[in-house]
Amino acid sequence: MISYGEQLSSPAVSPPLVRAGLRGPMMHGATFAYVPSPQALHRIPGTSAYAFPSLSPVALTEHGCPYGEARERHEPLPAKLALEEEQKPESGWAQELRRTAMTLLKLPLMVTFLYLFVCSLDVLSSAFQLAGGKVAGDIFKDNAILANPVAGLVVGILVTVLVQSSSTATSIIVSMVSSGLLEVSSAIPIIMGSNIGTSVTNTIVALMQAGDRTDFRRAFAGATVHDCFNWLSVLVLLPLEAATGYLHHVTGLVVASFNIRGGRDAPDLLKTITEPFTKLIIQLDRSVITSIATGDESLRNHSLIRIWCHRDPVEASTSMARAETNISRTHGNATMEKCNHIFVDTQLPDLAVGLILLAGSLVLLCTCLILLVKMLNSLLKGQVAKVIQKVINTDLPAPFTWVTGYFAMVVGAAMTFIVQSSSVFTSAITPLVGLGVISIERAYPLTLGSNIGTTTTAILAALASPREKLSSSFQIALCHFFFNISGILLWYPLPCTRLPIRMAKALGKRTAKYRWFAVLYLLVCFLLLPSLVFGISMAGWRAMVGVGAPFGALLAFVVLINVLQSRSPGRLPKWLQTWDFLPHWMHSLQPLDHLITHATLCCSRSEPRSPQLPARVFLEELPPATPSPRLALPAHHNATRL
């Protein structure tokens, strides 16, 4: 029988046996092998403790097996949790009772933090509207600019990012169409832009999981799959709409075919729960933004902060001037009283109040999200996590496997209809994607269903319009609905067409390696690039074609070369099989990463090695019966003897 020591690359020397006063025969076993303890393993530079299914610590080093990918491939749970579970002694009934009580205590705390998380999103939206609501109204007011489809798309993105609410942006568009200030055909690109702008919220939420690279990679991929779907859909459907008027004609036929009657407002299911808390912080009069957008300058100097409210909550509230200081007053047949929120008597301008609320809501959002992730990480581990992962990510049995994704879309649409906000739903599932509970392949159809769910809310809201405005309002809501349906038909039915998943995974890997790339992505995709396109579109369509055509051709060439380099490099010339002929900064983010690292005074990515420790540690092959892999370490290292 081959001893353990003979299988090591460098033979281990057994220490001399200390003969004590023992009676009876002494048995000499095989040569001792060194297995580092978890404490010693953490002191080895460049290694990371990882648990295989046998829960034995193994050092994954520079031998071509990235730690994050290997951990996700073998075990979805963090190695630290698995090691803690292995080292935890068996508990009695008292410890079991204490653990159960702690679990029951965490559940109401999780519900509380989730409630505060949703409320912080509502306050965040109000903060953005205070800071940039009137600017958004001014942007909508220039009809000559909105007649350009590309400019209309950019306006939709910027306005939705400014007010952090696609519902507010859509209501402004519906009001402008209803009043005759904007044609339906000109409003369709703005609807597309608002669909892109609303996806910025869950991308911001994903930034809160930047502490762990593996979680951040999954969370950012799960958040940006929404962005990728919206951008790809716009790249196909916007030129199609500009050339043929596809959405305008289809929705016009639907409106003309049905005898549509006005209905009730969309149900406020989530707001009924959150408004008692958010109304104590701030209350806004959003009609000011709509009035500015429709050309009514009488409310130009009015504040968005609501001062006077109706006593009857069913009636619409009317905003009064801040100069009134009475506790109650009569307006027509309605008795009004002063609103009850923190900023009701403030003398600060709207911008200052908006910045205060922006900072406070971001702090509350980050705190709630971090605590939620920690509690989910403690609850969803071991067998519980495996069961939940299996239930959520498992497909239906054959031959109905293909139905699973569409069923997830129905679930996403229903949940979004209940909470009345796609941002809230997608922001809620983003931490679960980061923890690995929901796979990105399952998060993708849930997000598509969320897109559909938010359009059904807009349709119900359009049905509440007056009869003379019903037709145009309903047509705009249907344009939003058919835009998302068309995008699903383009990018979901066939597995080969699900490009948003592959694009999101590539973005996730990039941000896990360079975490500053996530902030750069947000600034470029939702602010700098739309602003640049908007500025070029102001110069006319000739400037758009002159700048956009060469840039589009260059982008298409780079994408084509990248695909050929990864799949069939032999078809390319030798000098084009890699991008090494270009300067390093043109095909790699490492120079920029080095610059940003030094500019922010961050520590270097590589840890200094001790001269007493080896540069590399390699795994050794073990017989199948051995429960714990071993490392070839020098004899002077502290190790646990087996």
UniProtKB/Swiss-Prot annotation:
It catalyses: 3 Na(+)(out) + phosphate(out) = 3 Na(+)(in) + phosphate(in). GO terms for biological process: cellular response to phosphate starvation; intracellular phosphate ion homeostasis; phosphate ion homeostasis; phosphate ion transport; sodium-dependent phosphate transport. NCBIfam families: 2a58, Na_Pi_symport. Glycans are attached at N301, N326, N333. Belongs to the SLC34A transporter family. It is a multi-pass membrane protein. Interacts via its C-terminal region with NHERF4. Interacts with NHERF1. Interacts with TMEM174; regulates SLC34A1 internalization by PTH and FGF23. Expressed in the kidney cortex. It holds the Pfam family Na_Pi_cotrans. InterPro entries: Na/Pi_transpt. Involved in actively transporting phosphate into cells via Na(+) cotransport in the renal brush border membrane. The cotransport has a Na(+):Pi stoichiometry of 3:1 and is electrogenic. The modification Phosphothreonine is found at T511, T626. The keyword Membrane applies. Residues 1-106, 167-168, 374-415, 491-516, 565-642 are cytoplasmic. Induction: Up-regulated by a low-phosphate diet. The keyword Transcription does not apply. The chain crosses the membrane at residues 107-128, 149-166, 169-188, 351-373, 416-439, 470-490, 517-537, 543-564. GO terms for cellular component: apical plasma membrane; brush border; plasma membrane; vesicle. This is Sodium-dependent phosphate transport protein 2A. GO terms for molecular function: sodium:phosphate symporter activity. The modification Phosphoserine is found at S14, S37, S610, S628. Keywords: Cell membrane, Disulfide bond, Glycoprotein, Ion transport, Membrane, Phosphoprotein, Sodium, Sodium transport, Symport, Transmembrane, Transmembrane helix, Transport. Residues 129-148, 189-350, 440-469, 538-542 are extracellular.
